[in-house]
Amino acid sequence: MASRQSPMAVSQPDHADRSAALQLTPVSRETERRLDAYLDLLRQWQAKTNLVAPSTLPQLWTRHVADSLQLLTLAPDARRWLDFGSGGGFPGIVLACAMAEHDGGHVTLVERNAKKAAFLREALRVTGSPGTVMLADIGDNVDRFPQGLDCITARAVAPLHQLIGFARPLMTEGSKALFLKGQDVEAELTEATRYWKIDPQLHASLTGGHGWIVEIDRIERQALPTASKEAAQ
């Protein structure tokens, strides 16, 4: 009988996957080292805390890291970031690893799961990246979040119309939101415009597939009946 492959064997880094990701989204050697340390930690924690889908472990770099790094090309001057629902750290920890090279760079990671929040704090410590982890629910604690943000991000957290509602009170002149979305992005945009006046830009993901990035720099509320307004929260 063939032996079963161990979890450790499955989660070993794939150097071809790493090279492919760094060709798509090049970073400095220092940032590469921080990302390597982060992914090593993620593989260790994955055995006890489900941080990413197990099927994506062999493609951590292309499926998750490059997907996160591409946001930097859309906000090259952003230094103060906030990531809703950071989970296993994509894109929040990846962005923090990159911000370590910039004066004033900082990422606030918002996560409601205590175990995942503990992982995020350890990832910041191990990589020496500038960031703060807030154990919070993104829908109930907006007043606690930092002000003066340059960019707000989210990936696989909530429907677009809800994310826009969470981001709106945190956005100021010159700030933007970058939301990573999948193949249903057009339907989500249609739903979002029922509640919000936005002028979104859509960017196809550099990692291919059906991924999209929704870029928003202006949000106004649509004139809606009270019941519809409550649904947008």
UniProtKB/Swiss-Prot annotation:
The lineage of its organism: Bacteria, Pseudomonadati, Pseudomonadota, Alphaproteobacteria, Hyphomicrobiales. Signal peptide: none annotated. Its EC number is 2.1.1.170. InterPro entries: rRNA_ssu_MeTfrase_G, SAM-dependent_MTases_sf. This is Ribosomal RNA small subunit methyltransferase G. Belongs to the methyltransferase superfamily. RNA methyltransferase RsmG family. It holds the Pfam family GidB. It comes from Rhodopseudomonas palustris (strain BisB5). It is found in: Cytoplasm. GO terms for cellular component: cytosol. Keywords: Cytoplasm, Methyltransferase, rRNA processing, S-adenosyl-L-methionine, Transferase.
